[in-house]
Amino acid sequence: MVTIADYKGKVKPDWCPGCGNFAQLSAISGALAELGIEPKDSVITSGIGCSSNMPEFINLYGFHGLHGRLLPVASAIKWANPKLTVIGYGGDGDGFFEGTQHFYHTAKRNVDITYIVSDNQIFGLTTGQASPTTEIGMKTKSTPEGNIEKPLNPLTIALTAGASFVARAFSGDALHLKEVIKKGIQHKGFSFIDVFSPCVTYNKINTYDYFRKKVYKPNTDTKDFSSAYKLAQQWDDKIPIGVLYDVESPAYEDRDSVISGKALVDIPLVKLTPEHLREFL
């Protein structure tokens, strides 16, 4: 029987006390354990940032990659060994700045991975610059007179790109966060989960209290694209969290004749020929 203790890493997290990433670490570990997935059967990939140190803090296979490039790595791992449960994990700066193109195209392909973004609306590792989700008017080290750029909406991007599972959660509601992650992992196809993760050090606006007053769980038809898109645009007074969109759609691995036939990992190395490799190119 798998327990959450099986996922406890040997390295102690170095996040600031109160960081929303702690709740996400617990939620990811709990979700995998409750689904009966063993550490040896799961992988997490990350880029650069405070949240991207996650592979060091959780006991499963991990790949700490380049800034914004965690999704190509996650996709490659899934294609090489479809039996693995693959999670991509990073921050809003990593995923929505350098990683925007990978985010869009991975969603479009509907690769069977779960992508969790720790969205604190700030660059935390570099001590407080505006990120792609920073709100208009917010003063940061890179926007001392206030941010003049409209924040990016990751949910509408995921929906229009073709993601088959789109959700939002809040680190201040750990049990709900865990359940959303469980649903994302169980979903066959690209699962995107944007998590409000307050940065207690560099973002004094989007705090735990800020989100507690605004978030709510709508009773919605998760098969209805129009409804999901409308909810994804709500922000000012009320912000919906939970699964907004969840539909069945063939995953990339099931549509690719080579990957769906025989996984690369199942071909013995002694028999691996240049012809085999060409099939995967």
What are these regions (language model features)?
Residues 1, 10, 199-281:
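Flexible, low-complexity linker and terminal segments
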Residues 1-124:
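Thiamine diphosphate
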Residues 3, 83, 131-184:
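Conserved thiamine diphosphate
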Residues 38-42, 80-86, 108-113, 118, ...:
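Short coil/turn connectors at secondary-structure junctions
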Residues 45-47, 89-90, 114-119, 194-196, ...:
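Short beta-strand segments
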Residues 48-50, 120-122, 173, 196-202, ...:
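Glycine-rich beta-alpha junction loops
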Residues 129-138, 174, 181-190, 204-217, ...:
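Short, surface-exposed, charged loop/turn segments at secondary-structure junctions
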